[in-house]
Amino acid sequence: MKLGVVGLPNVGKSTLFNAITCAGAQAANYPFCTIEPNTGVVAVPDKRLDVLAEMYKPEKYTPATLEFVDIAGLVKGASRGEGLGNKFLSHIREVDAIVHVVRCFEDDNVIHVDGSVDPARDIDVINTELVLADIETVTKRSEKAAAMLKKGDKKYATEKEAGEILLAHLNEGKPARTAALSEDQRAVVQDWFLITMKKVIYAANIGEEDLGKDENELELVKPVREIAEGEGAQVLVICAQAEEDISQMDPEEKQMFLEDMGIGQSGLDRLVVLGYKLLGLISYLTAGPQEVRAWTITAGTKAPQAAGKIHSDFERGFIRAEIVPYEDLVREGSIAACKEKGLVRSEGKEYVMKDGDVTLFRFNV
């Protein structure tokens, strides 16, 4: 699963990405500084793993991860291929959800591509380009569906209906994800790969002078919240510059800095956790002296498919899953103690995995 980081030039997108991955993507003060997408794999913060590591003292510690892609800066006209438009559109189609970085800080030293700071306008610029790209896609698919219907292929009826609803919706400047589609219609348009069907986190990038202030009172953040509420999108207030500085600190220094600022968790950690949830992901855990590990699965995954994340043989020869909830294991102190109290459950092929299940799979091939 991938999260694409997008934004107009000079809004702090590459600075945020540097902080996310410590990858050092060039954050130059001019448009088009990042042409190819940089990709970074980030650990998902999970205190449960730290507790299990203390219990088991494992040789290996492996957290769940999330992939972020820094997508080239966008300008007006991208949907027509202007600027880096064609590259932008191809890269953004490949991600599963979008982190849209919005500039919510004033700084005379950082040029704004439109000459002034206006979060609502910036959001509209990018969203308009994405909507225009989707209109082109939907128009082509609708025309194809209509042609196939004329030839008597009735299976295209749902596609045609969905296309009509989507075109009317997109032409109002609204994202595809908020269109009133039936389940059947939503299913048939999945392989249209519409950009505005993807879920969005608006990362409101504030200046360091606004750190520690009431986020709800920040004037430049208010329009971002209003737009997000109308779309059913998420908002995360973050200071990319501070996060880049924090990302270069050692763990103790980072903790002291966060405590001094009165912050429980860094903005980046909150972004990663929010992204994980937005993608509908959960973690089951495995623990022992060799390794403590979080395994990423989609919510609703059944035990055999979860086992397949470890190895295909585990799924093919699945017998059962021995499961103890994380809270029970920590309270009792060991799997043996949990077994004595009857807290270890044996689950079969239809069991739907839960976040925090500490699991041992039994299989035979």
Residue ranges and their predicted role:
Residues 40-45, 72-82, 93-156, 169-182, ...:
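Conserved Switch II/interswitch segment of TRAFAC-class P-loop GTPases
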Residues 92, 353-354:
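Short, well-ordered loop/turn sites that connect or cap secondary structure elements
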Residues 6, 32, 37-40, 47-49, ...:
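Short capping/connector residues at structural and topological boundaries
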Residues 2-6, 17, 144-352, 359, ...:
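C-terminal-of-GTPase-core extension/linker across diverse P-loop GTPases
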Residues 32, 46-49, 62-68, 82-96, ...:
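Amphipathic alpha-helical transducer elements in NTP-driven molecular machines
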Residues 1-111, 140, 145:
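Conserved G1/Walker A P-loop phosphate-binding module
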